[in-house]
Amino acid sequence: MIKFNSTNKTYWLPIYIMNDTSFQSGMYLYLLLTEILLYVGTGVIICKTVRTFLKIRLFHRNMNIMTALFLCQWFEAIAAKLLIIPYQIGVIRFSDYNKPYVSWWTDNEQEIIVLPEPTANSNALVISGFLIWHYAYTMIFGILNLGIERIFATVMLKDYENKPRLYIPVFLITSTHLITLTFSYFVLTNRTGFYLGTSPCFLNSALVVMTFLAVWKVNKHRHEKLEGSGPGCDYTLSQQFQVRENYRALKLAKNLVIVVLCAISVPCALLICLVIGAIPSFRMIFIHIMENFIYLNPVIICSTLMFSAPAWRAEYLKLIPGYKKIKSTRVFVVRPKPQTTHRASSTVVHDEGQMYFEQLNNSWK
């Protein structure tokens, strides 16, 4: 945390270590280089993931738009992180003091970095901190948007697919950013305090779980009604498609929700433990774990998303160098199936989403 005497304002920066020159030598340099390479790899994985689910369209455009923006928000955080690194390792100094600062949040005036007035370096640090807070809270609230979009799809079952309804993602994305920008500013300027600042993490996680379970129950009942052979199923073609899409989307979202909630809750829990001093002996280890959960979590999220659908998985695995060659030279397959059946099932699985959309579009011509 830093404070400016000229304005008497205190800023809570999402940075634990500042001005530590020990990171400029030895093992820490290799660790820093490794982290930067991991960030580059994470960016490649995000781009590949977004390209894959936009190329192989398995779900409604509104859901694709919101998922793409949700994942691409990571680039905001990593740009801020790369700007902060020189301050963390002491290459750029924002004061004349040479000692390192180790703190996250505190109400002890002696542990706060006090500066006479804002400078260009300190302003850059504050802006970077704001971007990281914005990314963190957008991630917390963004996962809820995917559930709300499925609520719209569930309620508007009659004609959701044949009308674009771009106002839904626009409204959800705009309202989310208005909330997160405002809340990020309050957290940055330390107006919320520590516990109020971290409370959305757990409150929103509970809300996401309740929303998911409610939508899942409704759509599971509709899917069972559609697939059953008994009377009472009078869905139109578009409604049948929407029921199937909702059910497939929620099956995909189940693992994704679990992974995202873990990616949100674990750093928040570690942050609370660090602030209250519950883990002083392993502080540095948990700092790196917490930061990696924040900046590297798209690797787990994207992999979970891509492995949820066979068509996406096949495209995603092409990112592995030599994957095509390994696949073509494989000599045996565990529990092989007849070739004709395998081909037929693979084609159906690969084109299932595309086939639904084509049939739906043809029915409305």
Swiss-Prot record:
Membrane topology listed for this record = Multi-pass membrane protein
Its transmembrane ranges are 26-46, 65-85, 124-144, 168-188, 196-216, 256-276, 285-305
Per the record, its GO cellular-component terms are:
membrane
Q: Which UniProt keywords apply?
A: Membrane, Transmembrane, Transmembrane helix
Q: Where, per UniProt, does this protein localize? A: Membrane
Q: What InterPro entries does the entry give?
A: 7TM_GPCR_serpentine_rcpt_Sre (IPR004151), Nematode_rcpt-like (IPR053365)
GO process terms (BP): sensory perception of chemical stimulus
Similarity-based family: Belongs to the nematode receptor-like protein sre family.
The name this protein goes by in its record: Serpentine receptor class epsilon-38
What is the protein's species of origin?
Caenorhabditis elegans
Q: What is the lineage of its organism?
A: Eukaryota, Metazoa, Ecdysozoa, Nematoda, Chromadorea
- The gene that this protein is the product of is sre-38
